[in-house]
Amino acid sequence: MGKRREIIIVSNRGPVTYQHGLERVREAKRGGGGLVTALGSLATHHDVTWIASAMSDVDREIAEESGGQAVEERLANGSDCRLRFLAHEPSAYDQYYNVVANPALWFAQHCLWNLIREPDCERSGLMQAWREGYAPINAAFAEAALEELSRRPEAIVFFNDYHLYLAPRLVRARAPEASLLQFVHIPWPQLHCWRVLPEEITVAIHDGLLANDVVGFHTTRWRSNFIQSAQSVVGAKRVSGETAVSHIGRKTCLSARAISIDPDELAALVDDPRVREHERRIVETRPEYLVVRVDRTDPSKNIVRGFCAFELFLELHPELHGRVSMLSCLDPSRLNIPEYEDYVESIQREALRVNERFQRSGWTPIDLQIEDDVHQSVAGYKQYDALFVNAVYDGLNLVAKEAPLANERDGVLILSENTGAHEELGPFSLTIDPFDIRAQADAIYEALTMRADVRRRWIGDIRSWVREHDLAWWINGLLHDLESCLANGCEPDALGEEQKTVHDDG
């Protein structure tokens, strides 16, 4: 991991959130998602202060009791950090998270808008939410980061994701020499996807990001798109001979390093008794072939179109009726946002329609499980013959990296060309266009009928790649990129050099 550094992590969600248990005893629940796992591993090797939003009433109690200061926290991986909760004004946070971040920025960056009707920035109150929610919440994060920097002036400030595009500029204005790093965990689309948002927003986003010393993306594709949009939106200049741009007198190096997983942590989860119990049920009820998808109920995951593809597959191959099912383990996501709630209803309707058309005694084509159950998902990882990942766009997609390491059937990965993971794993998977239903149906059949030796070779290649390019590789690489940028500048092939450009569009 190199030398021990002081790092101030800044993210919307923190590593834990607190609830009251029996007799109102405070109980910590680990924060969800791969981001928490990735950032939490930093605390194992570095001196970490973590700034995050208070997500529960108990979190807010802790923030008040601590006077807004950081408190010592033991993370799930056994490492220690200082955790500072920010208790935001509820109305401002609602506008920040439920109007601007989701759906506006999420939909723009995943190219999800129905452009005939959306976005309607006036009726949605987007500009009001930007000014009264997103901007002040970012200012609160920046103020907290500056306070922590005053105690640890040599620390790296590590901003994360699309919730915090404005904070770096606010920190830079008052701490010109600070070391600032930001990683964008979702896709960075082409310029036309940004043009659907008001100019005030797109200019501020690009200006904020360019206050960092290094901005990281999962892929060269997303990085290339950022270079193009930064040049167009704020007039940034490409630095000759480097993978960097300059803006108002400051150079920002641009890194392309795909986040990854901790294979040891996944192996421990695979052996969990709760996973084995779910796996026992799957083995007892599964047909000859099992197609598995594991996703959040997010429109970007393309679940409804995936069910249409499975329906077409069944139309084309009646000989496989009763012999194949699709297990869909879906984690409910952002159901307080109308677009997400509507999408869950669409998922349920589509699964019901396909099942009513094809099911017969003892066979249900689509086994739809909508619940937050990581143990069921990992059991699905172990048992798939084909893993189906057809996201419209996805910054990376960690399922594509996790599942092959857990799988016990030499399963085949079917992977959307618009996922960040495709830049790494494309040679070892069946590539699909996420908008082409026939291509997806054909890929399911090809996966289930692939020669055994090819299946073994492909999944072995994925495992080797992921184990070599694991979470430690990602973290070490980002810190190296920052140190290199601050010391020597950034050469074209020095940042994320092991990843190759696959696409220049999207």
Q: How would you name each of these model-derived features?
A:
Residues 1-506:
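Catalytic cores of carbohydrate-active enzymes across secretory and cytosolic contexts
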